[in-house]
Each structure stands twice: as C-alpha cells, then as structure tokens.
Amino acid sequence: MIRTGFTGMRERADMQIAAMTFRLHAPWVHSLKEKRMIVRSLTAQLRNRFHVSAAEIDEQDTHQIIVIGTAAIVPHSAMADSLMEEISAFVEGSTEAEVLEETMEIR
C-alpha cells in the first residue's frame, strides 16, 4: 500500500497481523452457561487491555474446553512479538484454566 502525506512524498505503509490461539481446559465447568461466563470475561479483558479482536473460535459445545483466538494489526514484527508475549502472560495469569496449547503467527 502506498500513501501520500502532506508533503506529497510517497511512503510505504507496512503492517503485520499478529494472530494467537489458546486452548484452555477448565475442569470445574459443568455447563455451557458457566463456560460462557468465563469466555465473555476473558475476551472482554483481552479486548479492553490489549485492543485486539478476541472471540471463542472452536469447541463451543464442549463444557470444559475453551478455544479463544485473538488478532491484531501492528506496524512491525517486533511490536507483534512483544504484544503476543504480553497476551500470553496475561492469559496464563488471569484464569485458573490450564493452557493446553498456544499458537502464535505473524503474517
């Protein structure tokens, strides 16, 4: 993408997409209603704290497994790495659920 600033000079606008997936296990959850409360709380915290898109992306009908995906657009890969490390630490520290799997991708 090429954009033109006030000076009329053309510069290239680079961006990176940082995407993450978390697979969590919450053994104390016995209903979809309980699970929904956890998912809503965690996704809202991720959105508010890190300004990312966050949603439950899989296993919606399974009580004890939570799969949450996040995505953000950042100006460069160093910022993407930093953001993903912060999100990872936050997810691990903000819920009693065990993190079974975590994936990170920068495009």
Residue map of PLM features:
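Short, charge-patterned binding micro-sites
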Residues: 17, 55-76
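Short glycine-/aliphatic-rich beta-strand segments at the starts of folded cytosolic domains
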Residues: 16-27, 32
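A short linear hydrophobic-aromatic micro-motif
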Residues: 52-57, 100-102
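C-terminal structural segments of small proteins and small subunits
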Residues: 72-107
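C-terminal binding/interaction regions
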Residues: 35
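N-terminal amphipathic/basic-hydrophobic helices that include classical n-h-c signal peptides
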Residues: 1-14
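Hydrophobic residues positioned within well-ordered beta-strands of beta-sheet architectures
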Residues: 18-22, 68, 100-102
